């Protein structure tokens, strides 16, 4: 539909940004977000249908014009190298390197990007497709009394908080000696172009935010979604409920679905904290 942009989700944390999918014109949406371009450090592709990848050349050229020089990491299922090679024919000379990381299509995989843990899991679509979770893990609180009781020199406390192991005068100090139980971090999961799958439910477990496709709103169109390997609203809601997510955003609507809000109750009947996504929708998630 003319008023809807193609697929992309932008995640920002700790001075870096990560993009999931890059539909045509994604650079326009990023410009409207007002977060700049140079801190984009990675793009995660769910799969290689055009509405999820065709925006890559334009975005790469926009990043170059913005003065980006740091490497850009591209993650995706098998076929990543061939797709990127083809799309970058019209963006051949970039002032930054592209680092490609092909992810397995039939098993989970975890990558680390700074403080961010990126986990992929198989989705169920017509071609190899992945769902992603982005997680900031949080260590337990520092216990000064425990550190003092074990006579750990104060100059090592901050290093132990960062997870280092330290040798000192024949003794070994590690973070487990001074940190409590791990605290809840922040987790966002993204799934599009898939039938409901157990692998996605496990990936999304305990997410603060689950962004999931709902190609059709009404349950009567389920057979059509099955044939195209997509989900309807109520199926996305069941996934959110099964995964014990805190909030569900629906996205990736069929062009035939003019007003997603007309059918939002089909999802809310299953998972009450469901919202119909729209272009530019955003949320800030903080540690508890």
Predicted feature locations:
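Conserved beta-strand hairpin/beta-sheet module of binuclear metal-dependent hydrolase folds
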Residues: 1-35, 69-71, 132-134, 180-191, ...
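Binuclear metal-ion centers of metallo-dependent hydrolases, dominated by the metallo-beta-lactamase
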Residues: 107-108, 197-288
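Metal-dependent catalytic neighborhoods of phosphoester/phosphodiester hydrolases
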Residues: 55-62, 84-87, 258-266
């Amino acid at each position: 539909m003319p008023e809807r942009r193609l697929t992309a989700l932008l995640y920002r944390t700790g001075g870096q940004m990560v993009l999931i999918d890059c539909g045509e014109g994604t650079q326009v949406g990023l410009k409207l977000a007002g977060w700049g371009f140079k801190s984009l450090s990675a793009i995660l592709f769910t799969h290689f249908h055009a509405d999820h990848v065709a925006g890559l050349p334009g975005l790469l050229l926009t990043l170059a014009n913005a003065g980006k020089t740091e490497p850009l990491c591209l993650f995706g299922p098998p076929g990543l190298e061939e797709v990127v090679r083809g799309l970058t024919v019209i963006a051949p000379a970039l002032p930054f390197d592209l680092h490609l990381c092909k992810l397995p299509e039939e098993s989970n995989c975890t990558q680390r990007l700074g403080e961010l843990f990126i986990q992929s899991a198989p989705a169920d679509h017509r071609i190899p497709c992945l769902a992603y979770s982005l997680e900031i893990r949080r260590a337990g609180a520092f216990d000064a009394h425990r550190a003092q009781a074990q006579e750990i020199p104060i100059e090592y406390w901050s290093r132990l908080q960062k997870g280092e192991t330290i040798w000192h005068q024949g003794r070994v100090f590690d973070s487990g000696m001074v940190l409590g139980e791990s605290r809840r971090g922040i987790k966002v999961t993204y799934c599009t172009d898939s039938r409901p799958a157990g692998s996605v439910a496990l990936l999304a477990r305990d997410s603060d935010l689950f962004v999931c496709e709902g190609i059709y709103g009404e349950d009567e169109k389920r057979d059509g979604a099955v044939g195209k390997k997509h989900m309807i609203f109520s199926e996305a809601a069941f996934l959110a409920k099964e995964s014990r997510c805190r909030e569900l955003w629906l996205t990736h609507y069929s062009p035939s679905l003019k007003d997603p809000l007309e059918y939002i109750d089909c999802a809310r009947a299953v998972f009450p904290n469901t919202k119909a996504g729209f272009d530019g929708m955003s949320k800030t998630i903080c540690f508890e």
